[in-house]
Amino acid sequence: MKRVVIYYSLNGNCEMVSEKIAELTGADVLRIEPLKSYPDKGAKKFIWGGKSAVMGEMPPLRPYEFDAKKYDCIIIGFPVWAGNITPPIRTFVNDNLESLKEKKIAAFACQSGSGADKAFKRLNDMLNRDKLDATLVLIDPKDRPKSENENMIKEFCDKVELLQ
C-alpha cells in the first residue's frame, strides 16, 4: 500500500511527527504551506491563527504537487487551533476533496491543550465520512519525553500498516 503524509506545521511539532511516520511506514511526505505565513510567536500567533481557524478560512497555498491516484492511504497531520483543523489543511482538503473520497484516511494532531477530537470531527465532516481510519493525538511532542512520543507514533503507524 502506497502512503503519503500531508501536513502543515507552524512550530515544528507536526513536521517532526511527519518525518517519524514517513520513516516507519515508507510514506512520501508533502508539506503544505500558505502563501502568507502565520505569526509563530506571541499573542499574534493565537489571535490570527485562532481567528482564521474559527472563521473557517481557506488561505491560498504555495504551489505543491499531489496526485492522489499514486496513493492508497493519505495521512493528514496538523496542529489544533481553537478546536479546528488548521486553515492550510482545510484548503488542501477542500481543493482535493473528490480525489480523497475513496482513500484510506488517517490523521494526527498536535496540540498544547485540547480540541483534537473536535478537529477530527470537523475533518470527518469535510470528507463526508463517518470516521477516520486511524488517529493520533500528541501534546507538544517536541517537549514530551521522546520514548513516550515514539511509542504512540509507532502504535499509530502499526494501525496505518493494517489498513487495506
Please provide the spans of the model-predicted regions.
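Glycine-rich phosphate/pyrophosphate-binding loop and the adjoining helix
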Residues: 131-164
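N-terminal beta1-alpha1-beta2 submodule of the flavodoxin-like/Rossmannoid cofactor-binding fold
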Residues: 1-76, 83-85, 91-94, 101, ...
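Short alpha-helix in the alpha/beta-hydrolase fold that links the catalytic acid
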Residues: 88-93, 119-123
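Conserved donor sugar-nucleotide recognition element shared by glycan-biosynthetic enzymes
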Residues: 85, 116-120, 149
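Short helix-capping segments at alpha-helix termini
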Residues: 97-100, 129-130
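Solvent-exposed loop/turn segments at secondary-structure junctions
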Residues: 11, 36, 81-83, 112-115, ...
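Short, glycine-/small-residue-rich phosphate/pyrophosphate-handling segment
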Residues: 106-139
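Redox-cofactor binding/interface segments in oxidoreductases and associated redox assembly factors
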Residues: 76-77, 107
